[in-house]
């Protein structure tokens, strides 16, 4: 479950509490002036959502979000001569997003609603020349993403949901249930193509397959893609790898079915299929993944003509998240390494990929926005570009020669922003035979002679990792440091960054081994720093929300909790969510075949142990971690007289999109900890 996966059905049983919670949003409690200033500061960041370097390495394009509207800017590769992509309307008055340079670097394809109704995105191209001519390439009636040109530049392909009513993502607000569930109203994402001269989209992939991602073959004749039957939100965890002729109506063939293969890939997930430059094989990432888009695992390869997949990187102690072929025998790999972003070269033969040179390791989040930790490369693989941020530096575009290591920023979009929180450091400890890592933020204006409270923030997933990044106004733990807290963000077993065995170490053990890793980390910090053990707090979203509900049933160490989009009862959750396929790889069986393994990790079964004041927050259309789970936990706490509050946000999914709600949920969390875990030094 991302920062959690999809649902809605039984919300009707909570209509009255939901109405009350919704009304409460209209009259929030007074804002502490410090909180108001902090929220204002967080709201000033301009997010860089995508970066693309032209194939000839001469130009950059990026998507920057200002005032909740994405817009495109184009510059030379060194960041100079930056200017908005010119269209009708003032910059920021309409949407411009998604980027794809033509192979000859002469044109940039993108999506925009600037030429039509707000929200109705069509495909456009812009010439890079002096006139910057923009023309509409295709009219769309639905949701599109992942623009990609064929190698010959004759065809633009993209993922397309014709007639879509929502963004194609499990974290988006769920479509209200109506009609025959699982049969009526299904929205199928397919590969669509448009000629370079323009025209109506043509569907290339079958109507009975939901496509999650794809790539062109080097000769522009075929697609490789990851797909599954509908509903798409639920079935990514059982998706297969296909190859298909690029012409419409061609029949796909299965290259890899994780449900049938033998060996380490059996029953796991696959992502990021990429053709080798000579077209003879496909590489991909395979591993235990809790969320589409949160990619991590081992590198695999399979012959393009068919055959058994081979694990190229068994036993490595990092987690590859993205890669690109740089020759038939070399890969450039972005990976999570001990809580940091790392870019490395791998040498590849028929059966193994071996790490060679490390280009850089950064305590920062990096990526071009097209996939997790992706790099945008020039055609000769000598130049790269991406967006980067950390706890110390707000997002900027970074670009430069690959051979020179980590490139410098070439923009100053957020140069005026400075952190109001304390310094960050990586913390490491050993527990239960494993090495564990996490990140610690010191309180702002830290004084070693004083004692401070500490908030433990558990990441979502669980297959994910905390890597330093600049916070926005949405829910997150960094702002607590500004108000005088230590903030501890662990990467316990189940996280990315220390190899696939570490990721799989919390199978059938949610809330037990991983919680013990976290508590051991708290102990290690308390031995070195002036943390007040009587003022420990706990928070998290998605899987972190589950942990925030479960941990207080196992320990009394935490004195205040904020649980975001959590899971209180894995048994009832199994029948409520819309993404139950993710659970069997983790629990080993369905709840109907092994209810005990689900009960073992359910907070509701140990609810009598909870004494901790808990704020519970959730979106009413969260399909990944549905609202009934939050109601169930809140109701149980109320019945026992434990101080608690439940806030439900209308029309929100797993990831909140309304800026007012993003601000409100963080404000409430800051005030909750301020009430039950005051940050004054002692």
Task: Name the predicted role of every residue range.
Residues 76-80, 127-131, 195-199, 245-249, ...:
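Short loop/turn segments that connect beta-strands within beta-propeller blades
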Residues 372-682:
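Serine-hydrolase catalytic core recognition
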């Amino acid at each position: 479950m991302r920062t959690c996966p999809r649902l809605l059905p039984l919300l009707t049983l909570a209509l009255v509490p939901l109405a009350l919670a919704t009304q409460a949003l209209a009259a929030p409690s007074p804002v502490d002036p410090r909180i108001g200033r902090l929220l204002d500061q967080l709201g000033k960041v301009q997010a860089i959502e995508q970066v693309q370097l032209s194939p000839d390495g001469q130009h950059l394009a990026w998507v920057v979000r200002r005032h909740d509207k994405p817009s495109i800017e184009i510059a030379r590769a060194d960041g100079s001569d930056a200017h908005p992509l010119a269209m009708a309307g003032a910059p920021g008055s309409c949407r411009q997003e998604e980027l794809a340079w033509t192979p000859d670097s002469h044109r940039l394809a993108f999506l925009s609603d600037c030429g039509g109704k707000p929200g109705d995105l069509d495909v456009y191209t812009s010439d890079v020349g002096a006139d910057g001519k923009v023309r509409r390439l295709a009219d769309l009636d639905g949701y599109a993403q992942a623009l990609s040109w064929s190698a010959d530049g004759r065809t633009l392909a993209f993922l397309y949901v014709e007639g879509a009513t929502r963004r194609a993502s499990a974290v988006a607000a769920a479509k209200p249930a109506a009609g025959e569930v699982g049969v009526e109203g299904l929205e199928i994402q397919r590969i669509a193509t448009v000629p370079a001269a323009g025209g109506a989209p043509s569907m290339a992939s079958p109507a009975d397959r939901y496509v999650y991602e794809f790539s062109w073959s080097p000769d522009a004749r075929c697609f490789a893609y990851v797909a599954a039957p509908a509903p798409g939100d639920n079935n990514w965890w059982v998706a297969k790898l296909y190859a298909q002729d690029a012409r419409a109506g061609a029949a796909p063939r299965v290259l890899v079915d994780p449900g049938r293969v033998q060996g380490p890939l059996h029953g796991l997930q696959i992502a990021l299929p990429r053709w080798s430059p000579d077209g003879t094989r496909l590489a991909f990432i395979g591993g235990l993944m809790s969320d589409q888009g949160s990619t991590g695992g081992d590198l695999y390869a399979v012959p393009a003509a068919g055959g058994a997949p081979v694990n190229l990187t068994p036993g490595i102690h990092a987690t590859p998240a993205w890669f690109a072929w740089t020759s038939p025998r070399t890969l450039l790999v972005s990976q999570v390494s001990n809580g940091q972003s790392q870019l490395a070269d791998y040498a590849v033969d028929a059966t193994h990929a071996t790490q060679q040179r490390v280009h850089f390791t950064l305590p920062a989040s990096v990526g071009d926005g097209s996939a997790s930790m992706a790099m945008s490369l020039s055609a000769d693989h000598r130049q790269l570009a991406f967006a980067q941020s950390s706890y110390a530096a707000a997002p900027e575009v970074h670009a430069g020669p690959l051979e020179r290591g980590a490139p410098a920023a070439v923009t100053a979009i957020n140069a005026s922003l400075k952190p109001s929180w304390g310094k960050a450091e990586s913390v490491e400890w050993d527990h239960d035979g494993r090495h564990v890592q996490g990140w610690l933020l010191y309180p702002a204006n830290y004084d070693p002679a004083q004692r401070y409270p500490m908030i433990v923030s558990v990441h979502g997933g669980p297959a994910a990792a905390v890597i330093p990044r600049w916070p926005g106004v949405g829910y997150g733990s960094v702002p607590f440091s500004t108000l005088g807290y230590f903030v501890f963000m662990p990467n316990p077993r189940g996280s990315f960054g220390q190899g696939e065995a570490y990721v799989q170490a919390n199978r059938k053990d949610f809330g037990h081994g991983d919680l013990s890793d976290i508590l051991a980390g708290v102990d290690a910090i308390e031995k070195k720093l002036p943390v007040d053990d009587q003022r420990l707090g706990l928070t998290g979203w998605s899987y972190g929300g589950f942990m925030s509900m479960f941990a207080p049933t196992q320990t009394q160490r935490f004195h205040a909790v904020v649980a975001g989009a959590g899971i209180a009862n894995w048994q009832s959750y199994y029948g409520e969510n819309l993404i139950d396929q993710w659970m069997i790889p983790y629990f080993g069986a369905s709840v109907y075949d092994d209810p005990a393994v689900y009960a073992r990790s359910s907070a509701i079964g140990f609810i009598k142990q909870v004494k901790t004041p808990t704020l519970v927050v959730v979106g009413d259309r969260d399909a990944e971690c549905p609202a009934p789970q939050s109601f169930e936990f809140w109701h149980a706490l109320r019945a026992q007289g434990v101080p608690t509050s439940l806030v439900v946000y209308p029309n929100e999914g797993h990831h909140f999109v309304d800026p007012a709600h993003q601000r409100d949920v963080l404000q409430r969390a800051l005030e909750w900890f301020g009430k039950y875990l005051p940050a004054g030094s002692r």
